[in-house]
Amino acid sequence: MAAPLVPLSQQIPGGNPLYESYYKQVDPAYTGRVGASEAALFLKKSGLSDIILGKIWDLADPEGKGFLDKQGFYVALRLVACAQSGHEVTLSSLSLTMPPPKFHDTSSPLMATQSSAETHWAVRVEEKAKFDGIFESLLPVNGLLSGDKVKPVLMNSKLPLDVLGRVWDLSDIDKDGHLDRDEFAVAMHLVYRALEKEPVPSILPPPLIPPSKRKKTVFAGAVPVLPASPPPKDSLRSTPSHGSVSSLNSTGSLSPKHSVKQPPVAWVVPVADKMRFDEIFLKTDLDLDGYVSGQEVKEIFMHSGLTQNLLAHIWALADTRQTGKLSKEQFALAMYFIQQKVSKGIDPPQVLSPDMVPPSERGTPIPDSSSTLASGEFTGVKELDDISQEIAQLQREKYSLEQDIREKEEAIRQKTSEVQELQNDLDRETSSLQELEAQKQDAQDRLDEMDQQKAKLRDMLSDVRQKCQDETQTISSLKTQIQSQESDLKSQEDDLNRAKSELNRLQQEETQLEQSIQAGRAQLETILRSLKCTQDDINQARSKLSQLQESHLEAHRSLEQYDQVPDGVSGTSLPDLATLNEGILLAERGGFGAMDDPFKNKALLFSNNSQELHPDPFQAEDPFKSDPFKGADPFKGDPFQSDPFSEQQTAATDPFGGDPFKESDPFHSSSSDDFFKKQTKNDPFTSDPFTKNPSLPSKLDPFESSDPFSSSSISSKGSDPFGTLDPFGSSSFSSAEGFADFSQMSKPPPSGPFSSSLGGTGFSDDPFKSKQDTPALPPKKPAPPRPKPPSGQSTPVSQLGSSDFPESPDPFQPLGADSGDPFQNKKGFGDPFSGKDPFAPSSSAKPPKTSSSGFADFTSFGNEEQQLAWAKRESEKAEQERLARLRRQEQEDLELAIALSKADMPA
């Protein structure tokens, strides 16, 4: 495909007018470019298949530009000629000699002279794409837009209504009341031209007719169309009569004597066209009977684009024998008339001229009646004259009848046209009916779809209603809950208000109590001050009392002096004791009178009664007779007599109104009791609440008694199992000294540390065993013997002398079957260590008491070299085992990795 093209000078003869005319048809403006759509539309007229045309396009446009220049178009024409001549479609075939290409009727001079502007659509490709977008946006139905949908688009142009109406009439080419995609593009093109101040044509010019709406000429391989019903036979039969009448009228002036045989006239159908029409006839004559019917040529005739009335007239002209079928010459004549109308616009004649009659149907000319009449004039026979007159009469009648026939034929022709128009109307109505049925089907489909949507909406509505009911119920329940919560909240608020009021009341009471306490504290301070003053007075009284006692002692000494007076001395020589001590006693008494002197009574002074020597100095008179607090007692009332938190209404009363001490004066003293020695029963300071009350029995300390694990028999060092011998006291291990003797496990224990203290009541019975006897478990299997060390001969432990293991009291000897054994019960489990020593020798002989049986022989390891050899072997063996374990571990890791990789691989 990329091979270099052969120069045009070698491909196409210079100045070929046929190629120039073809190029002018596809590029009338000589732009030098032929678009793909124009080239494809033109090349399809060659009758070649799409595959061959695609190959021709690839060879003509090797660079893939999407269009053809003049040289490429010439190459395409040359390749079309190669394909039509039977040559291979390649670039090497361009140099071959071949006939020019044929593009249906374009090879005819008539088609060659046709205006090239008619083969191109004036709507450009980019405009068509834009108009197609607008067309799709209007939502066409079955590819058509109604006037209601197109009207808003046209009205947006602001053009006059008469111009828009003319645009609609011009664009609706098939007059179906709808616009398809191409017709809509024509309408939009006219609107844009009108907006550019171009006049709207009254008739749609051929360049604006879409390619799909253009009337095609009949060409080889095409499939034209013919009317469904052939013209009536009456009209078809009447056609030759016109010719006969015309011929009669035209030849009536001829003299019968001068009737001359006309020379043969050439047929109007050219020979080249006759050959081409014969090819079409052979393709159309499927039954090969030499005739084609109206159904067989219907599509060929309709493909020309002519009206059905005109095609019916052409059929009537061609069917000269009125057989309803066309022979080969008649078919060629009909195709000639169609070609003349399509290419030149020449209407077919009303009657066939002599040159139009097929050559095979040309016969002897019709004999002229006038010649017969003239010949009868020269006969001279009367009968012949009568016959001539009769013939003339008949001719006149015939003429009148022919006139009637022509009138009736004209009426029939009119009726036929009316019928044809009605048939056309019927066809249009049928097509409209089909469209309406299609619309009805669409409407029914839409109705069904809407019914389905309606059913879905009903289901959705029912669901929504159900949801609404559920939500309504939920809302009602929530409202009920809200109401209940509101009532609860209201009650709680009431409770809160009551609690607040109660709190306020309590706070007020607390404030009052605090005030009362403060007042009580103030009174208490006053009382304390008074008490302090009273205490000071008491102290002064005590000091005076001490002075009195000293005076008493002094008086006593004076009495002793009296007693020591000798008998010979006269009593008068001694001074009076009262007079002697009066001044001193007065000073000591602080101004006491003689009547108040406690030492005035001599009987009492010299009495030997000890009780009478110490009378109460305050017996005669109460020193605290006057109570300083008697007027206003601060403790007159009990401040805690009423509950301040009770529900009773609080009264503003004095919290200290009641005197707790009103019944008895705390400072009152009787004449017989000392105020400072007698204690009040209710004195809160008489006893210390934290001192130990000797009257209460003291608690017994559970740990105050003897140690539960102590032994009453442990009173001497000799009974201590660890007192005589340290089991680890020996610093040398050369002998068995200091080790427990396990050979005495079966012997009954001596009086151990627990035997005396616990006796038979300590652990003689298992505290955790059941009351019933438990069946004894089967005896445990003895442990396997310890393997002998890998060394030479050694002396067993059982053969050691007694000097090696001296006998000593065993602090760990087994507690045998003694009743005092806390760990062994005849009815319970046996001692787990009372069995055979696993380290003892296998000999059944009872070892002597001095032997140290039960220990492994550690001297059997041999000398140092043997021990080193044994250690080496053991280390090598351990190393081999370690390496074997490593190898096994590596193998297991490898197998695990392989298994994991297989598991991760996709199936």
Swiss-Prot record:
Residue numbers spanned by region Interaction with DAB2: 15-368
Binding, Ca(2+): 172, 174, 176, 178, 183
Keywords linked to the UniProt accession: Acetylation, Calcium, Cell membrane, Coated pit, Coiled coil, Endocytosis, Membrane, Metal-binding, Nucleus, Phosphoprotein, Repeat
Biased composition (Low complexity): 241-255, 703-743, 840-853
Membrane topology: Peripheral membrane protein
Gene Ontology molecular function, alphabetical: calcium ion binding
Record note on quaternary structure: Interacts with EPS15, AGFG1/HRB and AGFG2/HRBL. Associates with the clathrin-associated adapter protein complex 2 (AP-2). Interacts with FCHO1. Interacts with FCHO2. Interacts (via EH domains) with DAB2. Interacts with UBQLN1 (via ubiquitin-like domain). Interacts with CAVIN3 (via leucine-zipper domain). Interacts with REPS2.
Protein name: Epidermal growth factor receptor substrate 15-like 1
Record organism: Mus musculus
